[in-house]
């Protein structure tokens, strides 16, 4: 149930089309690129339309500090558990795995070039500031 919630929230943030990830998984492509997948952890620092500019700046600075901590070797999962406001925070930010073609094209271009353990830049989304970590590529 939690995985479903996480995927629905991610769909609103990151997916190229309104179809759910399950749709992509139940209609596999014969193209070899369809076998590519990336597994992700997330840290979300929420913002809302009602936040003041100072609150948004504070959230951005917090996200940037968390990214720096992760880049310096702190456990991304522990940082997510302690700081993320996303639905997968209790699971260390574990969002699961996503096949190529499910995420927004720009995000895929970034994530499918990252190596396991790499941490993304801070991204500003409708939900707030997001940091992603690739945990695995093409898992079997």
Predicted features, each with a name:
Residues 34, 41, 106-116:
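Cell-wall glycan
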Residues 19-26:
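Boundary at the C-terminal end of the N-terminal hydrophobic targeting segment
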Residues 72-73, 116:
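Charged, alpha-helical scaffolding/interaction elements associated with membrane systems
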Residues 8-18:
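Bacterial N-terminal signal peptides
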Residues 75-82, 120-123:
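Surface-exposed patches in mature extracellular/periplasmic domains of secreted proteins
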Residues 1-9:
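Bacterial N-terminal signal peptides that target proteins for export
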Residues 26-71, 85-102, 133-140:
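Well-structured core secondary-structure elements of compact alpha/beta domains
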């Amino acid at each position: 149930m939690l995985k479903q919630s996480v995927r629905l929230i991610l769909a609103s943030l990151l997916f190229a089309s309104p179809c759910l990830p399950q749709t992509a998984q139940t209609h596999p492509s014969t193209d070899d690129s369809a076998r590519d997948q990336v597994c992700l952890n997330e840290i979300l620092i929420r913002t809302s339309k009602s936040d003041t500019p100072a609150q948004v700046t504070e959230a951005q600075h917090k996200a940037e500090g968390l990214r720096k901590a992760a880049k310096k070797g702190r456990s991304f999962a522990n940082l997510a558990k302690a700081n993320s406001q996303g639905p997968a925070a209790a699971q260390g930010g574990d969002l699961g795995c996503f096949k190529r073609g499910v995420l927004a094209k720009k995000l895929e271009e970034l994530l499918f070039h990252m190596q396991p353990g790499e941490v993304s830049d801070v991204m500003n989304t409708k939900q707030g500031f997001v940091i992603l970590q690739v945990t695995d590529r093409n898992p079997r």
